[in-house]
Design a protein with these regions (language model features):
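Active-site neighborhoods and metal-handling regions in enzymes and metal-associated proteins
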Residues: 1-631
Length: 631
């Protein structure tokens, strides 16, 4: 890392103007959360592998900002002169730069890797000190990255109508109606999952996310896809052409946004008094925005974000079917894991009741590690229809590793499975037409007699919050941050909390994290709508000891309430994740009778729904694991 920092500082000194600081964001040209290997610039310069963060390099300091999910991981991965800056605890990066860099400082950033909103926020902070945000003409990190991975050329595929549920023509019609309503002649679409959803295409350019590196421009009478043409077959070009979409070179988007502004993009837009260009300030790059007349730009959330988040009936049906198949895979995995732990440690059950020994039963057994069991889970999933890979790196974590919220085990350094430690597994998969995030709703595996009092006390509180959120009934127009308290309140009563959000949407064979809806302590003024998805995943983490996280995926439905105060309409959640909670890990005396009734009802549905997908041994195990609980 020292050599990389030295090389970057040399480029900063020779830059015109000389740079006092260089910002290296995590994002790519599309403001993606997950990026391809060649776009992991922040990871390259800092060594921090988490998905979220921002690096700042000055002439004598190197700082890394990240959120609460990654505090522990960043502490372990940052070396040398790198210093961790904790978001929401330490000064924000723009505040730090304004207060710690000299007046008139020049602060460099690749404008393609920063959004309009972020860049403008920084500029406002810098103006107080006459500091300047400098858009570098090339990415300085790329200049020092000697073995940077090559660009991807994976083929683009079509998401057929029987899976998409809505045609490109239909989606373009609805989008153009929104353009007309906002008096906009066109819209620039930069978010990868929005481009993929709008044009019913998919790809493999980004690990775990079936998207294509591409931009889109849609006007009142034309639509364009900007992509590396090497990825697009004649069949895909024909499909897009029939849908009214023209394929252009990826780099042509820069010049075409200028033509769009002057209405010289061929064919010209049917203006009818509309001269605004719509750009999402949170996803459109500052580079593209800088090419436009700012007075003629409509800075507003992309209408595709909400359209994509509200699933159509075909998408919802696929989502539910995917979770049933995944529930069967999880049960098969736990049955296998139970058997392995019995053979190795002599326990009568890893998930069910039984006493484990501290020593292996016999030495010749194949070693079980966080990675080998994770690979086995993937193999069970891979046996299911339409499997297309994982939707994010599996978090397979034993003991203290489970306290690292987004822990990713590596074969060389991972821990061995241990019957006397908590095991947490957070995983998800892509199925051709669906995506799901599925966690064994109770991931801890250990004998209750060996548990610390902290774990014994906190597991039911996490479950209480999980149940409370999943059972919520709320008026139409409610935003996610209003519901977030339901999941946290049981922990708050003990003076405890968790640093991540409680819930996010999931895509339809797209990204595992999908907005604009969010259930989080961070306010986001986006109402929750019927047919949206949301995860329900409270947790608790004790550094150096264990981690707890319970998660189901929910679908928002209309609630059949007795009354309808204010004629608002009321909504509730439908659970679509099916896998058993680990009863032996729960202090049932801490649950109310109503919570135990809910748990038993959920387990009854698990048995009924998953039974057709399990063999005799697996079904017998499931029946045992879901026997009615009582305090």
């Amino acid at each position: 890392m020292a050599e990389i920092l030295a090389a970057l500082r040399s480029l900063m000194s020779s830059h015109d103007p000389p740079l006092h600081a260089l910002v290296v964001p995590s994002e790519d040209y599309h403001q993606s959360e997950y990026v391809s290997a060649r776009d992991k610039r922040r990871e390259f310069v800092s060594g921090f592998t988490g998905s979220a963060g921002l690096a700042l390099i000055t002439m004598n300091e190197a700082l890394l900002w990240t959120d609460g999910r990654y505090f522990l991981q960043a502490t372990q991965e940052l070396t040398g002169e790198w210093k961790l800056m904790r978001m929401l605890e330490d000064p924000a990066v723009d505040v730090w730069m304004a207060n710690n860099l000299p007046n008139d400082a020049a602060i460099g950033v690749d404008p393609w890797c920063v959004s309009i909103d972020t860049a403008q926020r920084w500029e406002r902070a810098f103006a107080k000190k006459q500091q300047k945000l400098v858009q570098t003409s090339t990415n300085l990190v790329d200049k020092v990255w000697k073995n940077r991975p090559p660009a991807e050329t994976y083929p683009v595929t079509v998401q057929q109508i029987e899976f998409a549920g809505s045609s490109v023509v239909e989606k373009l019609k609805e989008l153009r109606e929104k353009l007309t309503n906002e008096k906009a002649r066109g819209i620039i679409i930069t978010t990868l999952d929005e481009v993929a959803w709008l044009y019913n295409i998919r790809g493999t350019d980004v690990p775990y996310c079936p998207v294509v590196h591409a931009f889109a421009i849609v006007t009142t009478n034309a639509a364009f896809l900007y992509v590396d043409k090497r990825k697009v077959s004649s069949e895909v070009i024909s499909f897009l052409k029939e849908s009214g979409v023209e394929v252009r070179d990826y780099d042509a988007v820069s010049s075409d946004v200028v033509l769009l502004q002057s209405n010289q993009l061929n064919p010209p837009a049917d203006v009818q008094g509309s001269d605004l260009i719509w750009a999402d300030p949170n996803s459109c790059s500052y580079a593209l925005y800088s090419k436009l007349n700012s007075d003629k730009v409509l800075l507003q959330q992309s209408p595709l974000a909400l359209a994509k988040a509200i699933k159509n009936p075909v998408e919802l049906d696929g989502l539910k079917k995917a979770h049933i198949r995944d529930g069967a895979a999880i049960v098969q995995y736990i049955v296998w894991l139970d058997k392995q732990m019995q053979e190795i440690y002599g326990a009568s059950g890893y998930f069910l009741e039984g006493e484990a020994t501290k020593e292996k039963k016999h030495s010749g057994t194949v070693k079980l590690t966080e990675v080998t069991v994770s690979d086995k889970l993937e193999s069970f999933r891979a046996s299911k229809e339409h499997f297309r890979g994982l939707s994010f790196p599996t978090i397979s974590s034993v003991g203290p590793n489970a306290a690292i919220m987004h822990y990713s085990p590596q074969s060389e350094t991972c821990a061995e499975m241990d019957p006397n430690s908590i095991y947490l597994c957070d995983s998800g998969a892509q199925l051709f037409n669906y995506i799901f995030e599925a966690l064994t709703p109770q991931k801890a595996h250990m004998q209750m007699s060996n548990l610390s009092m902290a774990f014994h006390d906190q597991t039911p509180e996490v479950l209480k919050g999980h149940i409370a959120l999943g059972n919520a009934v709320f008026p139409n127009g409610t935003c996610g941050h209003t519901l977030d308290i339901l999941a946290r309140l049981p922990l708050w009563k003990y003076g405890l909390d968790y640093r991540h959000g409680t819930g996010h949407g999931v895509g339809s064979y797209l990204n595992v994290h999908e907005g604009p809806q969010s259930i989080s302590f961070k306010p986001r003024n986006v109402p929750i709508h019927a047919s949206m998805t949301a995860t329900d995943e409270p947790g608790y983490y004790e550094d150096g000891n264990f981690g707890i996280r319970l998660e189901n995926v929910l679908v928002v439905t209309d609630a059949n309430t007795k009354f309808n105060f204010g004629d608002k309409g009321y909504m509730s959640f439908e659970h679509i994740t099916w896998a058993p909670y680990q009863i032996k890990m729960i202090n049932l005396k801490s649950l109310t009778p109503e919570e135990i009734d809910w748990l038993n009802a959920y387990h009854s549905r698990c048995r009924d729904i998953l039974a057709p997908y399990l063999d005799e041994t697996e079904l017998a195990w499931l029946k045992k694991a879901t026997e009615p609980a009582s305090a």
